[in-house]
């Protein structure tokens, strides 16, 4: 790991609780860290969750398709399709390294595809196994939400997409946002 004194920011993709639950307590402990998200995302998380309005003190407003700096990194937020408030993926550059972060997306949009194809390092969700979701205990409305274009990517869609974009310039792929109920790391 790296010392927390070197961390300069938290990039929020959207306002769902699994992404923002501990952000305020974290920045209260590490006061030098900024919270980077769009103003709409910040308003959504303050409206939807019992997080202190003091989070605004740490907010660094960003706008999609406009590069911004976080320490030695240049980052850019871009549109992804999901059912949160003003969802974003991130394209992060540090020297020759290009990192795309795409979690919580129901399908690969044109903008997400554009940035993921440029990445040397890719974080992409493989949220659920379709058979496990279908056989699982979630109510039908939740299963439909997860499967929708504004929901999550299933393993087969993620695998097919990765096979399509793979090149020698892609150094590492990190599968993330795996459902604990509808997926396995295998």
How does the language model describe each region?
Residues 16-20, 43-44, 84-85, 108-110, ...:
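Active-site environment of divalent metal-dependent phosphoester hydrolases
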Residues 7-15, 36-39, 100-104, 123-125, ...:
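Active-site neighborhood of phospho(di)ester-bond hydrolases with catalytic His/Asp-centered motifs
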Residues 1-2, 63-121:
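Core dinuclear metal-dependent hydrolase active-site scaffold
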Residues 7, 56, 119-120:
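Short, well-ordered alpha-helix to beta-strand connector turns
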Residues 1-37:
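Active-site metal-binding motif and surrounding structural segment of the metallo-beta-lactamase
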Residues 110-186:
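Cap/insert and terminal regions of metallo-dependent hydrolase folds
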Residues 41-61:
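Active-site neighborhood of divalent metal-dependent phosphoester bond hydrolases
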């Amino acid at each position: 790991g790296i010392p927390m004194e070197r961390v300069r920011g938290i990039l929020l993709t959207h306002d769902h609780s699994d992404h923002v639950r501990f952000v305020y307590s974290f920045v209260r402990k590490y006061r030098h860290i900024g919270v980077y998200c769009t103003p709409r995302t910040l308003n959504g998380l303050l409206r939807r969750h019992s997080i202190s309005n003091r989070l605004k003190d740490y907010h660094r407003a960003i706008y999609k398709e406009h590069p911004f700096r976080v320490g030695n990194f240049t980052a850019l937020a871009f549109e992804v399709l999901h059912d949160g408030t003003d969802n974003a993926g991130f394209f992060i550059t540090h020297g020759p390294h290009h990192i795309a972060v795409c979690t919580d997306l129901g399908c690969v949009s044109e903008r997400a595809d554009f940035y993921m194809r440029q990445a040397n390092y890719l974080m992409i969700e493989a949220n659920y196994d379709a058979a496990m979701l279908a056989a699982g205990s979630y109510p039908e409305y939740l299963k439909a939400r997860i499967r929708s274009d504004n929901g999550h990517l299933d393993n087969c869609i993620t695998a097919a997409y990765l096979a399509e974009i793979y090149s020698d310039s892609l150094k590492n792929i990190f599968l993330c946002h795996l459902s604990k109920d509808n997926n396995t790391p295998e």
